[in-house]
Amino acid sequence: MSEASRSAMVSSTRFLAWAMLCLMAATAPVQAEAPAPSSDARLLQRIQEAARELDYSGVFAYQQGSSMQSSRVTHVFDGKSERERLELLDGQPLEFLRKDDEIQCLLPQKHAILVETRTARDRFPGLMIGGADQLMAHYDVSIGEQLERVADRDCQVITLQPKDGDRYGYRLCADSESGLLLRTQTLSPEDDVVEQVAFIALQVGADVDRKQLKPRWKTEGWRVVRTSLNPVDLADLGWTVGEPAGFRRILEVQRSMGGKPDVKQVMLSDGLAAISIFIEPYGNGNKHPQQTGPGARGAVNVVGRRLGDYWITVLGEAPTGTIQQVANSISYAPAAARRH
């Protein structure tokens, strides 16, 4: 696969990556009553609770390889309801407004607002998809002895070392005072940083100005697009999707938006990392790369392949081998064939 084709495929899936942020719905899976959490689990849970329950406003940088993008986030919690505004400061303007589980994605260049229910996956400074105990089944947790400094705040270093090669490792730094996640680094099997997100300026607590929750854009007259999401059982439709060790299925939906062809989506998670599979009709005006194969942008690896009349995209924050394994596991047997 040529470098140009690889780059084109990665770029063509950027919308899907953004869809994971603003257009993906999931309810948290029902979990059995868990035993009392360990001290490490409580520390990870504190990070998650801080992201949801604290008032904070700041600018963070997201680095993937040689590229970097900055964003501004403002989050407030009144004891019952969350409100959040996230604004991309580089590249094409893009803004996310959230009130509890509803997310609006503002696209000023198209004068459009995309509306959908929030995904189960929290973005930075959130951390986990599932509970801390689920995460610890697949990662060894170690706590650093010395504090570090991020955004002019002391933070505690926590390292999550994967127990197998199917997932990345992580090095976190959580605010020693509030528990808020200040930096997360994604680590390769060689312990190299392949991606990181870190605050570069931050306010926490009463100093947060709630006026910063207001959108920059006047959206009167903008087109509002609501994505229709319907639960679907892909096995009943003839699809088989393999799950890497430790990953489990947390989402299966068919999504419809405007007059575009329906897209089926499966989301797998180990409690921290997530892998999404998108299944859409091949052709019919859809733009797909001329070549299949893997591509990468930072820690996010992506594999695209054609399967009969469908195009399959698998992407997620997992090593290339894991993403390729999922892509290779996907098969389809039409209903007529399965009856014989």
Predicted feature residues:
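Bacterial N-terminal signal peptides that target proteins for export
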Residues: 3-17
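Bacterial N-terminal signal peptides
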Residues: 17-26
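Sec/Tat signal peptide C-region and signal peptidase I cleavage site
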Residues: 28-32
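N-terminal mature ectodomain segment of secretory-pathway/periplasmic proteins
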Residues: 33-111, 137-186
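Acidic/charged, solvent-exposed loop-and-adjacent secondary-structure segments enriched in E/D, K/R, S/T
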Residues: 105-127
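Extended beta-strand-rich segments in extracellular/periplasmic secretory proteins, especially
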Residues: 129-187, 192, 221-266
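Surface-exposed amphipathic alpha-helical segments
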Residues: 178-180, 187, 191-210, 312-340
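Short, solvent-exposed recognition patches
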Residues: 220-308, 320-321, 325
